[in-house]
């Protein structure tokens, strides 16, 4: 995953699992939590806030 992932929109995906993960919000310039459905989505999804901040901030 490269830094371009940080510019992708938040993508929940079509599945119905509820995993708390993080994405980089380019509007607020912060890593924020969201509920990920568990499948598909994109690369702007991180297991921890620290992983998100390491790549995107």
UniProtKB/Swiss-Prot annotation:
Site (Reactive bond for trypsin): 16-17
InterPro entries with a match to the protein in the record: Kunitz_BPTI, Kunitz_BPTI_sf, Prtase_inh_Kunz-CS, TFPI/VKTCI-like
Top-level taxon: Eukaryota
Pfam families, sorted: Kunitz_BPTI (PF00014)
Cystines in this chain: 6-56, 15-39, 31-52
This protein's GO CC annotations: extracellular space
Family matches, as CDD domains: Kunitz-type (cd00109)
Record flagged with keyword NAD: no
Keywords in alphabetical order: Disulfide bond, Protease inhibitor, Serine protease inhibitor
Domain BPTI/Kunitz inhibitor: 6-56
Gene Ontology terms for molecular function: serine-type endopeptidase inhibitor activity
Keyword Disulfide bond assigned: yes
Protein's job: Seems to inhibit trypsin.
Protein name stated in the entry: Protease inhibitor
Species name: Sarcophaga bullata
């Amino acid at each position: 995953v490269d830094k371009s992932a940080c510019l992708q929109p938040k993508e929940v995906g079509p599945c119905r699992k509820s995993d708390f993960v993080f994405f980089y919000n380019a509007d607020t310039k912060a890593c924020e939590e969201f509920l990920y459905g568990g499948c598909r989505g994109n690369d702007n999804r991180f297991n921890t806030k620290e992983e998100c901040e390491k790549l995107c901030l």
